[in-house]
Every structure is written in C-alpha cells, then in structure tokens.
C-alpha cells in the first residue's frame, strides 16, 4: 500500500486529488469476469507501471535536485560602501594644532568595487593603507582640509536566489528584491544610496549548484517515454507532468512535486506559477527507499501466497488480496464465485481516503456506483461482514501515513525572500576581517589666514577692533592738539618777554615794567 504511494503520483491524473499519494487502489474499469485455473494466477509488477504498455526499459542519466537541498540557494557576495574621510587641522597664533575628523559617504562604481574586492583577496598592501585616516597637514594661522576616499568591502554578505527566475532576495535590497537584472551579473542597489551589493563570483550561474546527476531506466513504448525508474528503484510516471525551468535548465515537474531533467516529453505543457517544486531532503529519500523495500516485500508476500495456492490447490479470499495491483494502471482483479476462481481485466486508480470507496455502510464504490457483492464477496479479498460492513484486508500503515504527511508538508516554494541578518556577521570583529578599499589620491586644501574663530566671533572682534581703533584715533588726535597748544603758549611767552624789556637811564637793562618803576622811583627821590 505504501508502495503505491509514489508510483501513483504520476498517474494521479485519474485521481480527484492530483499530486497526492493513494491510500489504496481500486478498479475504475472492471470486467468482464471469466473463470480461470489457479495456474493462471500471477503477481503484479508494482515497481513498473505497465499502463499503456510502456514496458520497454533502457538506462539513462538525468539530473534532479541534490539530496539535502534546502529551500533557498545562498549566493555569497560582498557590500561596497563609498567612504570619504576628512581631516581639518588649525594652527593658532601660538602654534597649537587642533585636528578634527569627519566622515561622509559617496556612491561607488561597480568597476572600482570589483577591483577593491580583488585587492582584498590578493592581499594588496593598499588595503591596509587605505583604512588609515588621512595624514593631517598644518600651516600657521591656517585651516588645512585633507580628504581621502575609500571603498569599504565587507564580506560575506549572503543573499537568496530564486531558482525559478534566478532573482535575488534580501532585506538589504529595496522592496526585498535586487533592482538590477534577474541575473546579478553586475551589482544590486541596496537600501543605502552609497552601498552596492555584488556577487563574489562574477559568473553568477555557478551559484546555482543545486543539481546532481542520477542514473535510472526509462520506460517507453514506440519511442514515447511514459515514465522512468529512478536511482532508488521507484517508478515515476510522466502523466500530469509540466515543463519547468530551474536555474535556466529545462525539465519536468512531476505530479508529486519532484523535478527531473527529462526534456523529450512533448505532451507536457508549461507549469503555472503556482506549481512549485518540492524540496529533496534525506527524509524523502529514506521514505522512497522504504517504499521500494515495501514493494519488494509485498511482492515476496504475493509470491509466497501464490506458492501456497499452488501447493495446497486451494484459494482463500485473504490470499487473493495479495494479487491486487498496488499502483495505478492496468492489472488483474480476482474473486471466487460459487467456488470458482474468476479473473477480470482492471484498470486501477488511486484512493486517498476510505470514504471514496466506502461512502456508506455496505457500499463498495466502483465506477461511481455501489458494486454488488456475490454471497457477501466482492473481489481482491474484499468481503461484506455479517453486520453489513465492507471489510478490506489492507489497512493503512504508519509508513504510508508518514509519507503522505511528509509530502504534504514539503510542498513549499524554493524561494525564501528574506535573508537572516545574523548570517552576514557571525562575530563582532568579522567586519574588520573583510575590509578592502580602493584608495584615490589624497586631496589637500589650505585656507587663508585663519584665527580659528567662528563667524559671529569674527564679526564681533572686527567690530570691537574698529571701535578700539576709532577711540585710539580720537585719543591720539586730542593728545596731538594739546601738544600743539603747549608749544604755542611757550613761544608766545618768549616773545612777550622780549617786548617788555627796556634800558634804564643808567644804561642797565630793566627786565620788566615793575622793575623799571622801582628803579626809576629810587632815582627820582634821590
């Protein structure tokens, strides 16, 4: 039963629930019945779906998803950020130097970013040198500005690739998607205008390493491929398959959601956007191995039952259940009528739930109606119990249920649009380990004489200086005037002294009028 599982997926075309593995198989075409001898009994080949007579097997190689392939394709790259480091030095009147560093950003070019990354990988010494701040120069009473442009390379920076169209997805991209071409042949813009993302490998096609080559056998009829036996021995039909490209490689998406690189199936149409590919992990591979083992075990049980029938020359309903075909396709159905072994050609379809074939008590639904029992016997070991319930020998196994749940849970898209930021840096100092820089020439700019004052302080001092100079000018003018007055007064006094000096009668010089009066009076009295 578990076996039917994978094989039917291909034949799910006949199932109301395409893409699901069956719980059971029941004929949708049956009859007519004819008596046979026990020597005509045979065990069906459940490993090969013999539908449409495609029984010719030939070896071939095909590609499928790698085992252990996760839901996303990780593409390693690096971010390139343009950084401008600016140093300002000012030397005051006394020779004291003040240095200030500032950082700005600029948008780099992809060519320079690629060169910078190559320098980092090659260990170019310019990488180390360009990380240093520009060497500050200085001039007395001047401000010297020195700028240095660098390209900061940080790697690894991992993004996700969608294998359906090879587009890139990450939180760092605007709207979560690379704004460039679908193939990251050049660069991707980021949420920061001054940062670009580029793939480490300039040939991004190499990043799509998700396939592995397997060997199997093609089942065909007249050159038409009906299906194939995969590397694990499980048959998969191409019925219901659709064409789908993964990472630019053409192939087929089968009904079970798996993908193979079979390209000569002309009847297949292109898949719709909602038809995604299932992941291929170790668990699904393990289940496939178990299914193949179960199919082999069921065939051995069938052969044991057939041997018992031949040995004992007797047939029971329970033994007939081993002869049922476990996968969809053409086969045989057996029953016992009036102690006579009967056989009929049948085409089996998959059954997902028991309600599909037992809609009500006592009803076994075959060909859209309740199949009539004969003396409480249907076919393939199915009987009607005394209380009127339909009894089927096979019961759902835990392995089958496990596989059904596995397939249902793994139908997820390969795209994973959001990258985990924690995958970029694993430790705090990792960014410093992956820095690489493109170093243009250092630029220097020397200002005029500068007192190191702000603009308002400069105007304030200029105004105060003007007032002081004006006051000094006034004081100087006043002082000059006073000096002139003193000099003139001294000159006038000398001239006056010269004018009032007279000669007395005795012939002596009299210096003043008063002296003259005194001297004259004395002479007069005598």
From Swiss-Prot:
Give yes or no: UniProt keyword Transmembrane.
yes
Predominant location of this chain?
virion
Q: Which regions of this chain are Virion surface-facing, per the record's topological domains? A: 20-459
Biotech applications: Primary surface antigen capable of inducing and reacting with virus-neutralizing antibodies. Almost all human and veterinary vaccines are based on the functional aspects of the G protein.
Q: Any extra detail in the entry?
A: Arg-352 is highly involved in rabies virus pathogenicity. Its mutation dramatically attenuates the virus.
Q: How does it assemble?
A: Homotrimer. Interacts with matrix protein.
Q: This protein is called what?
A: Glycoprotein
Query: Which species expresses this protein natively?
Result: Australian bat lyssavirus (isolate Human/AUS/1998) (ABLV)
Q: What is the lineage of its organism?
A: Viruses, Riboviria, Orthornavirae, Negarnaviricota, Haploviricotina
């Amino acid at each position: 039963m578990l076996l039917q599982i994978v094989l039917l997926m291909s034949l799910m075309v006949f199932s109301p629930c395409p893409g699901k593995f069956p719980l059971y198989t029941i004929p949708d075409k049956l009859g007519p019945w004819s008596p046979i001898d026990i020597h005509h009994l045979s065990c069906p080949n459940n490993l090969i779906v013999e539908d449409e007579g495609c029984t010719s097997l030939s070896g071939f190689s095909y590609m499928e998803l790698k085992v252990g392939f996760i839901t996303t394709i990780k593409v390693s790259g690096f971010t390139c950020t343009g950084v401008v480091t600016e140093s300002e030095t000012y030397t005051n009147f006394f020779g004291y130097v003040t240095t200030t560093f500032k950082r700005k950003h600029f948008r780099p070019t992809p060519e320079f970013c690629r060169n910078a990354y190559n320098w980092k990988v090659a260990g170019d010494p310019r990488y180390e040198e360009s990380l240093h701040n520009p060497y500050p120069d200085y001039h007395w009473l001047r401000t010297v500005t020195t700028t240095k442009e660098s390209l900061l390379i940080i790697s690894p920076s991992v993004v996700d690739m969608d294998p359906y169209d090879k587009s890139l997805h990450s939180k760092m991209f605007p709207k979560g998607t690379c704004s460039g071409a679908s193939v990251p042949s050049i660069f991707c813009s980021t949420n920061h205008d001054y940062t670009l993302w580029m793939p480490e490998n300039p040939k991004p096609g190499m990043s799509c390493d998700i396939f592995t080559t397997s060997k199997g056998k093609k089942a065909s009829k007249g050159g038409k491929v009906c299906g194939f036996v995969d590397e694990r021995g499980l048959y998969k039909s191409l019925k219901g398959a659709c064409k789908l490209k993964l990472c630019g490689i053409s192939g087929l998406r089968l009904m079970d959601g798996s993908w193979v690189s079979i390209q000569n199936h002309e009847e297949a149409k292109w898949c719709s956007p909602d038809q995604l590919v299932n992941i291929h992990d170790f668990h699904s591979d393990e289940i496939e191995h178990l299914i193949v083992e179960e199919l082999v075990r069921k065939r051995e049980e069938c052969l044991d039952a057939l041997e018992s029938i031949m040995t004992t020359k007797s047939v029971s309903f329970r033994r007939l259940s081993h002869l049922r075909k476990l996968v969809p396709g053409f086969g045989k159905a057996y029953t016992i009528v009036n102690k006579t072994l009967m056989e009929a050609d049948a085409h089996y379809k998959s059954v997902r739930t028991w309600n599909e074939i037992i809609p009500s008590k006592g009803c076994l639904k075959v060909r859209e109606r309740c199949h009539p029992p004969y003396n409480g016997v249907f076919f393939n070991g199915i009987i009607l119990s005394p209380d009127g319930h339909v009894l089927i020998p096979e019961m759902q196994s835990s392995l089958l249920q496990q596989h059904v749940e596995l397939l249902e849970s793994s139908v997820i898209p390969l795209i994973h649009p959001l990258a985990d930021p924690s995958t970029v840096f694993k430790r705090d100092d990792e960014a410093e380990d992956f820095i690489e820089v493109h170093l243009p020439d250092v630029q220097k700019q020397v200002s005029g004489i500068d007192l190191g004052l702000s603009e308002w302080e400069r105007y304030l001092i200029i105004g105060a200086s003007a007032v002081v100079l004006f006051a000094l000018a006034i004081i100087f003018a006043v002082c000059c005037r006073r000096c002139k007055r003193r000099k003139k007064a001294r000159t006038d006094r000398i001239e006056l002294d010269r004018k009032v000096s007279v000669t007395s009668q005795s012939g002596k010089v009299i210096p003043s009028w008063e002296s003259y009066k005194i001297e004259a009076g004395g002479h007069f009295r005598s």
